[in-house]
Amino acid sequence: MDRMALVVGVNYYSDKRIQNLSGCVNDAEEVARLLKHNGDSSRSRNFDCKELYATGPDHAVNRAAIKDEARRLFQSKAEIALFYFSGHGYIESTGGFINGSDSTRGDEGLSLRELVDLANGSSARHRIVILDSCYSGAAGSVAGMENHAAIAEGVTILTASRSDQPSLERKGHGVFTSLLINALEGAAANLTGSITPGSVYAHIDQSLGMWDQRPVFKTNTDSFVSLREVDPAISLDDLRKLKKLFPTEDYEYRLDPSYEPRDEGRTDAMPPAEPRNNRVFSLLQKYNRHCLLVPVGADHMWNAAMESKSCRLTLLGNHYRRLADQGLL
């Protein structure tokens, strides 16, 4: 398998001065469950996940274990190497840290600088680091990294909060990972069913208020990468029909009452419903529901048909039309 993920959740900390957490392991387990298989009807395999969970004294995850497994991950020949951590984080003037069960001080954790160095030096084409910990936004920042480049080509970092913010738990679950899980389940999917790091960030960012913790997204990649696939909202065959129905970007598709299958509102002067046009209209309505087209001179598609108006593509619709025209769907 060319996709590998290291998923770490730390609830338990051996030092009594460090508060144990309640939702990190559950969050990490759910992230791993979603990464292992795609969410489309085929349920095809996705990431090969290594899981480290600290739940108590007999099941601790120490800093050395996190570092060793992170090194193994980023030294692999995987196409995509993904690191996820949920647990305590710490920041000081020299940078940030993520803390294993054996941490007695915040700066005894795995440094974010060291983690980013491992990702930067990896031969994997795509290296993705996702951190749900306090002050995780320090990862990839130039400050405190001296002459190190923040992130190398092919590296993407998504963190729960900025370098000066704590990460929040509500009802035993991290706010960030709850939204991450929602995104991976399909809320961040595009129309073709792909869930990307960028779409995950956009979903999380748009779901939080200005007074909440703010996620951080940093990437240095020029190629498309999908974290997970779900069933597309519109079939690829239907999306490919855009270029036939709309020969040009500014083309307006003319409608008339024969496109509407129902007789409600139809007068004797109007043409009857025509099955072929009804099938086309059903597809146009599907495009409209997914913001690919809008009626022209009418509030709704029904009005556009019954009043012999037209419909045209939106900017998003033209984007998918171009993809279809270029053979990219």
Language model: regions and residue ranges:
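Active-site-proximal C-terminal subdomain of hydrolase catalytic domains
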Residues: 9, 35, 127-218
